[in-house]
């Protein structure tokens, strides 16, 4: 059984005395004796086994005379201390008696008496009285006898000794006071339930005893106040040890889950709403909004984690329910491996293309050698020469063929023709059916015939014939069809494309494009269609049978840069690239528009972004030449020969995915201020070799390269930058024309 403590509130015992003393002294005249009221004795009832406070008796009042306090200063405090000791002894005995009895309920009764002319005061009102005033005792008054109280206390001890320690009966202790007056009274009863557990005999549980003064009622008579009874309720409280409550263990998240959900300042989880919502600084570190706001206001204008400078305006609230870092290391590793594989694949494709080109050249040489061998055998059979003569002639023939195949021929200067004294020549084109070379130029007589036109040159005698006016502004493109009617397609900055007949030197058809035209070309598969490349990147498709508007517009997929070149790739029975369509070159890249059943499907070619100035096509071998101006990665003009390829989509026989890859690179000077046009064509030797010719502004020349090994074969000098290059066949002779702003130079292959 838990031990119980008993506490005696001495101050509450003395408060009623102070209160009565104050009441009495306030009504007596000056110089009279002081009256001291002592608490009534505690009595025990044998019938009800309750404790009662004894009635107020006359001997409990001690009158203190201030006049005689000098002679009795020694004896008076002694009597008062004896009375106080007697009262405390009674309380101790009552507590010992009640320790053997296990009360379960204590009834407290507070009685209020209403007397005529009286006033009610609580015990707390006189607690401020000095303790020294209590011990002013008058020697004339005797001490109240205590014989009756001692007898009652002895009876209480005898009764408590008869009570068994193991008795489990419940007892009720009632503390009451008797009423002396005849006035009405009201009684309030408060019941307090006390649970008492059985205690072992060896360890009795002490009880805590508190004596509180409930009420003091005083009646003030005319001469001397007569105090009412002082009620001292006895409250017995039992203290039991409360069992320790088992707290639920705190759940801790694993470090990998906890670290991503807590604020780095307060180490509390952030929320998706409220003041502690998820926020971030400009450096990217995450905190609770209130924490980082207080951190920055406190003078530390830096990130708590990386110490970068920060301010309150840098706080960004993130709207996220959960925040988890996605592990992309495997994805990045796969990307790097994919890029490595793609680079190796491009390198392998480049080597494969070079090998195929070399195989083609060697195959052609082998065919020629076999043909020569057959001719030699026929000659030997006809003339019947000896074996030695056959061997010597065979060796001489083979050595001659090898010397010719090694490229001993070259272009030699033939003639220079002045086109315009004022310059501004831009492009040229050759009509093979009429052996006519046309060059764009401004009008030689601007006052009579303003605008721009073309000058016709005869390739047979290399003489200029006449000027034909066509456009009102500068001409940017010229193209002939594969028909023999001599129709010239021209594009100019006056928002028109025109068809001009070289037979009559007149314009036969005009189409208004609405925007400046930078390039044009014919459709090789169907000569009724022509294409016009505009300044906004679009390509307009015109049908010569429809003289009003365009039949279709090819809108660019990417940027709207001007179309600097247009070339048509005809269909061919080739496994490498059987598709036909128009190749569109802009300042940002290239796109191949595949034509099938009068419908066009775009294929973006993988070229280097930016810096593209021209794209030319060699339709027989499906190669194209892309010219790049100097940039950040390269400080010189580059010409890259690309091979067009196609792959079937989803095992379909009609759908292809078109692309290209580089085969050879040619480097020129470090200056490129003009949009020049270059040329890629087959060698005049007819051995399958491809030659590349491009202008070099730094040296004012045209450079000729061998595409197989990338070697520079020849450098054709000019007095100005070369703007356009045109190879042509005249009377079974191969010739090359280079155009500057004022003149044309003709070179012949010898």
Swiss-Prot record:
InterPro entries: RFWD3, WD40/YVTN_repeat-like_dom_sf, WD40_repeat_dom_sf, WD40_RFWD3, WD40_rpt, Znf_RING, Znf_RING/FYVE/PHD. Coiled coil: none annotated. Keywords: Cytoplasm, DNA damage, DNA repair, Metal-binding, Nucleus, Repeat, Transferase, Ubl conjugation pathway, WD repeat, Zinc, Zinc-finger. The keyword Nucleus applies. Residues 92-206, 387-406 are annotated as: Disordered. Residues 105-116 have a biased composition (Basic residues). One of its GO terms (biological process) is interstrand cross-link repair. Disulfide bonds: none annotated. This is E3 ubiquitin-protein ligase rfwd3.S. A zinc finger (RING-type) spans 263-307. CDD domains: mRING-C3HGC3_RFWD3. It is an enzyme of class 2 (transferase). Pathway: Protein modification; protein ubiquitination. It is found in: Nucleus; Nucleus, PML body; Cytoplasm. GO terms for molecular function: ubiquitin protein ligase activity; zinc ion binding. It comes from Xenopus laevis (African clawed frog). E3 ubiquitin-protein ligase required for the repair of DNA interstrand cross-links (ICL) in response to DNA damage. Plays a key role in RPA-mediated DNA damage signaling and repair. Required to translesion DNA synthesis across DNA-protein cross-link adducts by catalyzing ubiquitination of proteins on single-stranded DNA (ssDNA). Mediates ubiquitination of the hmces DNA-protein cross-link, possibly promoting its degradation.
């Amino acid at each position: 059984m838990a031990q119980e403590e008993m506490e005696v509130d001495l101050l509450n015992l003395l408060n009623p005395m102070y209160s009565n003393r104050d009441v009495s002294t306030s009504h007596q005249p000056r110089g009279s004796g002081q009256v001291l009221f002592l608490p009534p004795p505690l009595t025990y009832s044998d019938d009800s086994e309750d404790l009662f406070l004894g009635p107020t008796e006359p001997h409990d009042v001690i009158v203190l005379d201030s006049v005689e306090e000098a002679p009795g200063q020694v004896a008076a405090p002694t009597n008062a201390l004896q009375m106080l000791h007697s009262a405390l002894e009674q309380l101790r005995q009552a507590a010992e008696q009640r320790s053997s009895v296990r009360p379960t309920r204590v009834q407290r009764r507070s009685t209020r008496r209403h007397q005529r002319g009286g006033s009610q005061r609580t015990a707390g009102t006189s607690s401020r009285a000095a303790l020294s005033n209590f011990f002013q005792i008058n020697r004339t008054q005797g001490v109240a006898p205590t014989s009756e109280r001692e007898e009652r206390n002895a009876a209480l001890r005898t009764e408590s000794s008869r009570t068994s320690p193991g008795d489990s009966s419940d007892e009720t202790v009632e503390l009451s006071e008797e009423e002396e007056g005849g006035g009405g009274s009201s009684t309030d009863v408060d019941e307090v339930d006390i649970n008492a557990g059985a205690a072992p005999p060896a360890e009795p549980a002490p009880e805590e005893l508190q004596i509180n003064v409930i009420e003091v009622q005083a009646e003030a008579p005319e001469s001397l106040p007569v105090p009412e009874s002082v009620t001292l309720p006895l409250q017995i409280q039992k203290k039991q040890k409360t069992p320790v409550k088992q707290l639920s263990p705190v759940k801790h998240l694993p470090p990998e889950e906890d670290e991503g959900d807590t604020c780095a300042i307060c180490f509390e989880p952030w929320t998706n709403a409220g003041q502690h919502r998820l926020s971030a600084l400009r450096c990217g570190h995450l905190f609770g909004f209130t924490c980082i706001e207080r951190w920055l206001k406190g003078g530390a204008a830096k990130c708590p984690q990386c110490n970068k400078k920060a301010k309150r305006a840098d706080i960004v609230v993130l709207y996220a329910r959960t925040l988890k870092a996605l592990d992309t290391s495997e994805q990045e590793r796969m990307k790097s491996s994919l890029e490595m594989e793609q680079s190796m694949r491009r390198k392998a494709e480049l080597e494969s293309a070079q090998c195929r080109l070399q195989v083609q050249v060697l195959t052609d040489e082998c065919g020629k050698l076999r043909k020569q061998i057959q001719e030699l055998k026929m000659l030997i059979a006809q003339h019947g020469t000896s074996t030695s003569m056959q061997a010597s002639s065979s060796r001489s023939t083979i050595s001659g063929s090898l010397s010719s195949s090694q490229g001993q021929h070259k272009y030699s200067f033939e003639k220079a023709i002045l086109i315009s004294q004022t310059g501004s020549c831009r492009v040229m084109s050759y009509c093979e059916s009429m052996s006519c070379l046309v060059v764009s130029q401004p009008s030689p007589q601007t006052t009579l015939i303003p605008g721009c036109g073309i000058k016709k040159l005869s390739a047979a005698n290399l003489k200029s014939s006449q000027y034909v006016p066509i456009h009102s502004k500068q001409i940017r493109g010229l193209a002939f069809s594969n028909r023999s009617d001599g129709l010239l397609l021209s594009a100019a900055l006056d928002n028109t494309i025109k068809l001009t007949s070289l037979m009559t030197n007149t314009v036969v058809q005009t189409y208004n494009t609405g925007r400046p035209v930078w390039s044009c070309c014919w459709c090789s598969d169907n000569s009724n269609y022509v294409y016009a490349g505009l300044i906004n990147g679009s390509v307009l498709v015109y049908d010569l049978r429809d003289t009003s508007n365009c039949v279709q517009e090819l809108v660019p997929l990417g940027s709207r840069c001007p179309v600097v070149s247009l070339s048509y790739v005809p269909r061919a029975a080739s496994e490498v690239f059987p598709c036909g369509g128009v190749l569109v070159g802009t300042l940002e890249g290239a796109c191949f528009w595949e034509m099938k059943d009068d419908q066009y499907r775009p294929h973006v070619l993988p070229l280097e972004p930016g810096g593209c100035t021209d794209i030319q096509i060699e339709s027989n071998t499906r190669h194209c030449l892309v010219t790049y101006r100097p940039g950040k990665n390269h400080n010189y003009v580059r010409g890259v020969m690309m091979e067009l390829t196609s792959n079937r989509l989803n095992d379909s026989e009609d759908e292809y995915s078109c692309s290209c890859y580089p085969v050879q690179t040619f480097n020129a000077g470090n200056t490129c201020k003009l949009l020049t046009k270059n040329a890629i064509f087959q060698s005049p030797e007819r051995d399958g070799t491809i030659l590349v010719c491009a202008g070099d502004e730094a040296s004012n020349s045209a450079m000729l390269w061998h595409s197989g090994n990338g070697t520079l074969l020849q450098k054709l000098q000019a007095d100005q930058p070369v703007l356009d290059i045109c190879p042509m066949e005249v009377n079974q002779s191969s010739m090359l024309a280079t155009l500057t702003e004022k003149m044309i130079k003709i070179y012949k292959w010898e």
